[in-house]
């Protein structure tokens, strides 16, 4: 049986037994916060528990490395929607130690892309269109500096309100310990 079939089979039972009822909440975050975190599997349950968050408390936006790499990309758009449409009054950027994004390179990514059957012509077309793969697959050396950079992009976005604090934290994916990098109340 495929993973998709397993999911659909589980979902059928989940909905028939009305398991969803214990998760019902509104679309507005009770704690009025949006969190940008990494998509690392170790954080799926650890991060909310380490922050004492429950379903409905916050908006969680996930990206590789918790990076805001483009001020007008989908991550920044999601943060702006959380603030203006969903009543988030604070934003947290949460990176983590041992992040895979600190280890990737555009060269390695392109090799893996080609190994999966994507022809060189497509890659060249993308390059010709102006995409800089080194920038697009940007990694980092320091998670703390990376978090500060993402906080800076958010805070200085021309559409981001000045009165909304943007915090930066780093979580240990083994213990859940949070280290404060940027206190948005002080900026």
Swiss-Prot record:
The keyword Calcium does not apply. Keywords: Lyase, Metal-binding, Zinc. Binds 1 zinc ion per subunit. SMART domains: Pro_CA (SM00947). Transmembrane segments: none annotated. It is an enzyme of class 4 (lyase). It catalyses: hydrogencarbonate + H(+) = CO2 + H2O. Its cofactor is Zn(2+). InterPro entries: Carbonic_anhydrase, Carbonic_anhydrase_sf. Its EC number is 4.2.1.1. Belongs to the beta-class carbonic anhydrase family. PANTHER family: CARBON DISULFIDE HYDROLASE, CARBONIC ANHYDRASE. Reversible hydration of carbon dioxide. This is Putative carbonic anhydrase YtiB. It comes from Bacillus subtilis (strain 168).
């Amino acid at each position: 049986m495929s993973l998709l079939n397993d999911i659909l089979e589980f979902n059928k039972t989940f909905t028939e037994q009305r398991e969803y009822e214990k998760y019902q909440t509104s679309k507005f975050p009770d704690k009025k916060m949006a969190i940008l975190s990494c998509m690392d599997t170790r954080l799926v349950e650890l991060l909310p528990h380490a922050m004492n968050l429950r379903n409905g408390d916050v908006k969680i936006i996930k990206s590789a490395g918790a990076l805001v790499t483009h001020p007008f990309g989908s991550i920044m758009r999601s943060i702006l929607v959380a603030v203006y449409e969903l009543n988030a009054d604070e934003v947290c950027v949460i990176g983590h130690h041992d992040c895979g994004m600190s280890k990737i390179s555009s060269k390695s990514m392109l090799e893996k892309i080609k190994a999966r059957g994507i022809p060189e012509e497509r890659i060249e077309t993308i390059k010709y269109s102006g995409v800089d793969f080194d920038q697009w697959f940007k990694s980092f050396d320091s998670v703390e500096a990376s978090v500060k950079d993402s906080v800076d992009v958010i805070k200085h976005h021309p559409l981001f309100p000045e009165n909304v604090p943007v915090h930066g934290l780093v979580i240990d994916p083994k213990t859940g310990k949070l280290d404060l990098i940027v206190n948005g109340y002080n900026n």
